[in-house]
A protein has these predicted regions:
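Glycine-centric low-complexity repeats
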Residues: 1-218
């Protein structure tokens, strides 16, 4: 996905574009070897949010594209775009929110043991702008959820990690840091084992300020 445009003076940055979905190849079926099975394409990464104009808020990051499904290996979900940086001047603008990670592709094969794709990671929160009173850091994006297991005892994939919180702005009074979001959740089919949860997002740091709150694990 494309990056969002920068905001005019005092304006907010544009939201980044969503990443394209991964391709879905034809399922060849059968019990052929792993190397002959089709592989789904990875989802595109979301675009970064634009930088806010003077005093303006940074744009939010775009979401990652979904991973493509296939008969054997699935494409991974795209990563969320990073939040845009807040504009400087007067009171610094707040950082944009990180884009959400996309879910991994799901297994579709019934002829062999499938492997799941991983969910995309959440984009990092944008940094706050400097000057006057620092703006608050943006929160990290939400992690993508791992793809579901296939019909024949597939191992479920791990979920994506939560995006880290943005950094608080400097100057005058320091802004508060952003908070990390929770990791994604793995959900398998009845005959599949669940994958591990995504890691919790880390809170952002402020210059000479307190640290942000960590997200909860999935």
């Amino acid at each position: 996905g494309g990056n969002g445009g920068n905001g005019a003076a005092g304006g907010n940055g544009a939201i980044g574009g969503t990443g394209g979905a991964g391709g879905v190849p034809a399922n060849q079926g059968g019990n052929s070897a792993l190397g002959t099975q089709p592989v789904g394409g990875d989802g595109g990464d979301g675009g970064n949010g634009g930088t806010g104009g003077t005093g303006g808020r940074g744009g939010d990051g775009g979401s990652g594209g979904a991973g493509g499904a296939s008969g054997w290996l699935m494409g991974n979900g795209g990563n969320g775009g990073n939040g845009g940086t807040g504009g400087s001047g007067g009171v610094g603008g707040n950082g944009g929110i990180g884009g959400d990670g996309a879910g991994g592709g799901n297994a579709t094969s019934t002829s062999s043991i499938p492997f799941d794709a991983h969910g995309g990671n959440g984009g990092a929160g944008g940094d706050a702008g400097h000057g006057g009173t620092g703006g608050d850091g943006g929160d990290g994006g939400h992690a993508g959820t791992g793809g579901r297991g296939g019909l024949l005892a597939g191992q479920h994939a791990n979920s994506g990690n939560g995006g880290g919180g943005g950094t608080g702005g400097a100057g005058g009074t320091h802004g508060t840091p952003g908070s990390g979001n929770a990791g994604g959740t793995g959900t398998g089919n009845a005959d599949s084992t669940n994958g591990g949860p995504g890691s919790d997002g880390l809170g952002g740091d402020a210059f000479n300020g307190s640290r942000g709150t960590d997200g909860n694990p999935g």
